[in-house]
UniProtKB/Swiss-Prot annotation:
N-glycosylated. It comes from Arabidopsis thaliana (Mouse-ear cress). Disulfide bonds join 58-219. Zn(2+) binds at residues 127, 129, 146. This is Alpha carbonic anhydrase 5. The lineage of its organism: Eukaryota, Viridiplantae, Streptophyta, Embryophyta, Tracheophyta. PANTHER family: ALPHA CARBONIC ANHYDRASE 5-RELATED, CARBONIC ANHYDRASE. Glycans are attached at residues 91, 117.
Length: 277
């Protein structure tokens, strides 16, 4: 539906109050062996909030992620603007965190990153979940990429992309030799030569925007989520590579869907595309 004036004002107020009143976020844990994704397991998603006091938000939070993105219930916003980035080449390290593969950029960032509501967020790391954690109109995809950014005052903003099976993903192709070394040697990390985030095609003309949480412990809230509506492709070989490399004998590292609790979700569409919705 097109965003009504009252709904639009409510969305802006909700975003502004949430960001201003929130405290700095706690980042994702580096060692993921302390929890797992077994549905009924003692360390599974249902019990994450009980494993450590600092992880309590995983069980009691009201703005948790992932969620289902339903086009029939979004507020269409033509004013957010294209999703653009300003990145610089940076050295990086690929690390096996226990349940996913993470690429961490040296110095904690790769250039300027992104700007949201006048605040700069620098790129900290990239990691992948399979299958996707968020769903689109109830549909789950084979892979979801998370680009985790952080502001100077410690607030998080995540940019995510969905993947379907198809042609090889160029960025993952450039990482294959490093992932193979981790798989063969069981080492926990590999240094990567100069990486330019621009190689994985960042810009998006349509995206969802909402406030949520980190999808792994400590599940910190007040995270600004930006999820591209435009689909990427990945081969089955690349998909298997990302799972085999972590050595956790699991075929999934996706947290179950969480309740929206009446949170507003905006969908940015350029004005010249508005007639399509």
């Amino acid at each position: 539906m097109k965003i009504p004036s009252i709904g639009y004002v409510f969305f802006l107020i909700f975003i502004s109050i949430t960001i201003v009143s929130s405290s700095p976020d706690h980042g994702e844990v580096e060692d993921e062996t302390q929890f797992n994704y077994e549905k009924k397991g003692e360390k599974g998603p249902e019990n994450w909030g009980r494993l450590k006091p600092e992880w309590a938000m995983c069980g009691k939070g009201n703005m948790q992620s992932p969620i289902d993105l339903t086009d029939k219930r979004v507020l269409i916003d033509h004013n957010l603007g294209y999703l653009r980035s300003q990145y610089l080449p940076s050295n990086a390290t690929i690390k096996n965190r226990g349940h996913d593969i993470m690429m961490k950029f040296e110095g904690g960032n790769a250039g300027l990153g992104i700007t949201i509501n006048g605040t700069e967020y620098k790129l900290q790391q990239i990691h992948w979940h399979s299958p996707s954690e968020h769903t689109l109109n109830g549909k789950r995809f084979v892979l979801e990429e998370h680009m985790v950014h952080q502001s100077k005052d410690g607030r998080n903003a995540v940019v995510a992309f969905f993947y379907k099976l198809g042609k090889p993903d160029y960025f993952l192709l450039t990482l294959e030799r490093y992932l193979k070394r981790i798989t063969d040697t069981h080492e926990s990390q590999e240094f990567v030569e100069m990486v330019h985030p621009r190689t994985f095609g960042f810009e998006s003309k349509h995206y969802y925007r909402f406030i949520g949480s980190l999808t792994t412990p400590p599940c910190s809230e007040n995270v600004i989520w930006t999820i591209s509506k435009e689909m990427r492709t990945v081969t089955l070989k690349q998909l298997i590579m990302l799972r085999v490399t972590v050595h956790d004998q699991s075929n999934s590292n996706a947290r179950p869907l969480q309740r929206k609790n009446e949170r507003p979700v905006a969908l940015y569409i350029p004005t010249w595309h508005s007639k399509l919705y």
